[in-house]
């Protein structure tokens, strides 16, 4: 990677470190998502504690945190590998934000935004997988994990030159969901709708 690409990746990390969930909840007078609900500063938890409009604002901002640096990097002439590292930097910022004591979200929306510029085919299949699993199961976490496992295959099919960096991002997402995977295995994960289970 060039020195410019490394600096740009760090800038993407700083942008990703802006926790929209915390900021939106503060502006809207809602509880801190890091201390309420699932304790995850992400759109799904904000939906639980603050409603759909607050969650939508968080989701859009988180998507843009990943999409903007990758789009700009593309027009700045970064290589495919460097663009992948920029996407990874944005996701790392969301998950481990330097501005919020490294307590961040799961990175799903930011990863979606970072991967979407690769192409319409990748974006459509990625979104379609998440929606299908979510509609069938009601589990946001399960939708994210299955999507993360399948997205590298979609990328390999449509844009194989991006497969390795996208796989790194998806591995990070699966790792970040390890607690959710354990709760799903034990039948203790909460659905977005329907009867909620106790996570203790």
From Swiss-Prot:
Keyword Cell inner membrane in record: yes
Protein keywords: Cell inner membrane, Cell membrane, Lipid biosynthesis, Lipid metabolism, Membrane, Phospholipid biosynthesis, Phospholipid metabolism, Transferase, Transmembrane, Transmembrane helix
Source organism, top-level taxon: Bacteria
GO BP annotations, alphabetical order: phospholipid biosynthetic process
One Pfam family recorded for the sequence: G3P_acyltransf
Catalyzed chemical reaction(s): an acyl phosphate + sn-glycerol 3-phosphate = a 1-acyl-sn-glycero-3-phosphate + phosphate
Documented EC number(s): 2.3.1.275
Membrane topology: Multi-pass membrane protein
Localization terms from the record: Cell inner membrane
EC class (word): transferase
One cellular-component annotation, GO: plasma membrane
Transmembrane portions of the chain: 4-24, 53-73, 80-100, 115-135, 138-158
PANTHER family assigned: GLYCEROL-3-PHOSPHATE ACYLTRANSFERASE-RELATED, INNER MEMBRANE PROTEIN YGIH
Summary of subunit composition and partner proteins: Probably interacts with PlsX.
Record-linked HAMAP family: PlsY
Family: Belongs to the PlsY family.
Protein name: Glycerol-3-phosphate acyltransferase
Organism: Actinobacillus succinogenes (strain ATCC 55618 / DSM 22257 / CCUG 43843 / 130Z)
């Amino acid at each position: 990677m060039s020195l410019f690409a490394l600096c740009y990746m760090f800038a993407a990390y700083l942008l990703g470190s802006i926790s929209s969930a915390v900021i939106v909840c503060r502006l809207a007078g809602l509880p801190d998502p890091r201390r309420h609900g699932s304790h995850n500063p992400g759109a799904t938890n904000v939906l639980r504690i603050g409603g759909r409009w607050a969650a939508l604002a968080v989701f859009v901002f988180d998507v843009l945190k990943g999409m903007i640096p990758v789009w700009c990097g593309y027009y700045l002439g970064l290589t495919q590998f460097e663009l992948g590292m920029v996407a990874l930097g944005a996701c790392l910022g969301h998950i481990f934000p330097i501005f919020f004591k490294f307590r961040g979200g799961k990175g799903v929306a930011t990863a979606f935004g970072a991967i979407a510029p690769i192409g319409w085919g990748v974006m459509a299949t990625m979104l379609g997988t998440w929606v299908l699993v979510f509609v069938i199961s009601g589990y946001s976490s399960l939708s994210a994990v299955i999507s993360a496992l399948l997205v590298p295959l979609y990328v390999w099919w449509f844009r194989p030159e991006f497969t390795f960096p996208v796989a790194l991002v998806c591995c990070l997402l699966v790792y970040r969901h390890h607690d959710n995977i354990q709760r799903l295995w034990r039948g203790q994960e909460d659905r977005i709708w329907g009867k909620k289970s106790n996570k203790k």
